[in-house]
Amino acid sequence: MERAVEPWGPDLHRPEEREPQRGARTGLGSENVISQPNEFEHTPQEDDLGFKEEDLAPDHEVGNASLKPEGIQNWDDLWVQREGLGKPQPRDRGPRLLGEPRWGQASSDRAAVCGECGKSFRQMSDLVKHQRTHTGEKPYKCGVCGKGFGDSSARIKHQRTHSGEKPYRARPPAQGPPKIPRSRIPAGERPTICGECGKSFRQSSDLVKHQRTHTGEKPYKCGICGKGFGDSSARIKHQRTHRGEQPPRPVVPRRQPSRAATAATQGPKAQDKPYICTDCGKRFVLSCSLLSHQRSHLGPKPFGCDVCGKEFARGSDLVKHLRVHTGEKPYLCPECGKGFADSSARVKHLRTHSGERPHACPECDRTFSLSSTLLRHRLTHMEPQDFSFPGYPLPALIPSPPPPPLGTSPPLTPRSPSHSGEPFGLPGLEPEPGGPQAGEPPPPLAGDKPHKCPECGKGFRRSSDLVKHHRVHTGEKPYLCPECGKGFADSSARVKHLRTHRGERARPPPPSTLLRPHNPPGPVPMAPRPRVRAQPSGPSQPHVCGFCGKEFPRSSDLVKHRRTHTGEKPYKCAECGKGFGDSSARIKHQRGHLVLTPFGIGDGRARPLKQEAATGLE
């Protein structure tokens, strides 16, 4: 029996660490044979001990529990006991069995904990990398563009974008074992859902970041100015403003949009948004945000609203749109408590409390709190040729004659002759080569109103205005009041109506806006006539009728009252053509044209009176 143990015993240690007499001192007899537990059964291969399982003698019984030495509770503890010492030796670098942790690896009782957020790690190196997310340290710099990274592996991945290297190739199906598919979460299932707004996320970390928009928590502080941020990436972008750094430009060349399209994007923060949309000129910080935005210009829109039928390219846009119908406003202002349906609207509102004006005009150094206000202001500095379209150069504007004196009417111009059928054109408006072909309508200019109402022929510049106007003819009111159930055709009308439930009054206009003459640039042929608004009599009823002096709390009530003086009746009945000054009066009138079918006869629907004879009802 001892002959069978001798070939295996010396192979337990490497040649330079071989101790022939060690088995006698530790109590290992000739009958004690070391064997691996059943859970470590694997294919014969060389492991950390330096031998193979197939090298064992064929007459050994592997897995006999009776052969375990005395005092050894686990087979993994065999190699750490040295000559009566019952604990591992820290400086030992000998072989280790399977399942034994490496030296220097933190165990459960020696976990490395971050002092900022309390997150724990098994190794100190992982804690050092994690702390760079709090300090913003980026010691690894790219040699091509100079971009910094907190981890060396991130820099290696980034450098492949410059070199074009693709080291990972797909393995042919014939080589290697079959690939086992991982269990992934289906695209339609998102387990993490926000309890405030109902938005779903794929990862719990994204839900934690999103919930900070509701709670206002900002754990990441700037070390220079102390400003807080809810995301570490937002703090990194903010710190570029202190260091004067600019983000790297995209490698793919992009077509520069026109000056009119990028008028509002050339402010002081334009350098932080290198990705530009070629369709509308909007800038973005991340390329993924640009790709998500371009879906709104082209591609299908699978997300449709069940209330008004409007379609969206992203589900998040549909969630925001549904708040218009439900009146939900989950984003509250911490200063005044006002609610907003969108987080960006709350950010713009907070500027009214802080007085921040981040958008500056490069022409006159005037600052604005909104980018849309800056865009309208910059149009006053631009020349007419800046509004030309590709293929349709805009000629010099013909100076208009001075207006007639007050009290006189302008002279009537004769009618133009009938159209002969030839293409109509103006000098200087011939399309350039490469422009739109013949027969295609030119794009609408700034003063055109291409969207016409088929009922009354009124024109609008935007299609959304036409949709709102068309509700006047159809009587549709998709915006319902959650308190009393009253419907409104416009969301702003519902907002004004909600003030009556809360006991609020309409705000009077500030004194600075009552008299504001318009001074256009350039020489003025005659002094403009200022428009004088009616002075409000008090803060509770600012709207006064100019005919009889009656006061109203809302401007809509004043508009309805003026129709009693002017005789205007814009709401026409589709059956008899009778006009009404109020839409509610027309609805009451139209009920007289309908007759209800008794229960059990027909389909039970309301029909016009002209169909009464056909139904056989008296």
UniProtKB/Swiss-Prot annotation:
The keyword RNA-binding does not apply. The modification N-acetylmethionine is found at residue 1. GO terms for cellular component: nucleus. GO terms for biological process: regulation of transcription by RNA polymerase II. GO terms for molecular function: DNA binding; identical protein binding; zinc ion binding. Residues 392-414, 508-528 have a biased composition (Pro residues). This is Zinc finger protein 48. It comes from Homo sapiens. The lineage of its organism: Eukaryota, Metazoa, Chordata, Craniata, Vertebrata. The gene is ZNF48.
